[in-house]
Amino acid sequence: MLPRLVATDLDGTLLRGDGTLDDRSRRAIATAEAAGAVVVFCTARPARWLKPLAEATGHHGLAICANGAVLWDLHSESVVAATPLEPAIARELVALLGAEVPGGAWAVERTGGFGHEPEYIPRWPVPDGTTIDVVDALVEQPAVKLMLRHNRLSADALLSVAREVGGHLAEFSHSNSADGLLEISAAGVSKATALARLCDERGIDGQDVIAFGDMPNDLPMLTWAGYAVAVANAHPDVIAAADEVTASNEEAGVARVLERLFTG
């Protein structure tokens, strides 16, 4: 039986290293949708980064953003649902992690904008109206994602420390092994929980879902889905958890699997 829903991560999975989508992958997505499958982008990205991709693919359904904290309508460009990290929890996490791994810099992602400490160096363009302030001020409002960047620790190292000292407070992940960036969401929030909620609303069983990913933030989704596919360039933990390893993101790995399934 063909999958009823295709859930795919974007950066490092569906998209090439330069952030673009190749024609083969674009056609494969269209083929899956034409066959009746629901395609859902599941990403750590904020919603504001998705418009060009939606235009390039012609995909105007729903997207799961901010590692599951936001369900976004690509057609109306609006928030369907959001599960933010509350200020009291964010303050506690800042204190705990600041004591364990001093020297980092903080940033927050909200449904309506972005903010960061002066010491935080964004790797990507920030939106107009970005708030630059001390972390105590940044966490006064709920945030869909809290981020800690550290120049001397790897993302894996940050993840290990965070889970040890704050695992009872929030969800921790990262989406880029080459960047010392820890991503923090409210407790119980992940790509998997958002995807499960979406599937439940549509009457789709998890066993009828195929999921693609490359990084630790994809692991909950991959272990929840009926069939999990890692791209060849994936983190070792992701490869170990996958049912199948396809070609890399530079070699249209996602498209190869979709072609096999939906075109025979």
What is the meaning of each model-derived region?
Residues 12, 32, 67, 146, ...:
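Residue-level signal for inorganic ion chemistry
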Residues 23-123:
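Active-site phosphate-binding/coordination module
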Residues 57-59, 66-67, 168, 224-225, ...:
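Short, structured coil segments at secondary-structure junctions
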Residues 25, 50-54, 158, 162, ...:
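Hydrophobic packing residues within well-ordered alpha-helices of enzyme cores
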Residues 1-5, 21-22, 185-264:
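Mg2+-dependent phosphoryl-transfer enzymes with acidic/Ser/Thr/Gly-rich catalytic loops
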Residues 100-212, 216-224:
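Conserved acidic, metal-coordinating active-site core of Asp-based
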Residues 36-40, 59-61, 145, 207-209, ...:
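Short active-site oxyanion
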Residues 9:
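Active-site residues of response regulator receiver
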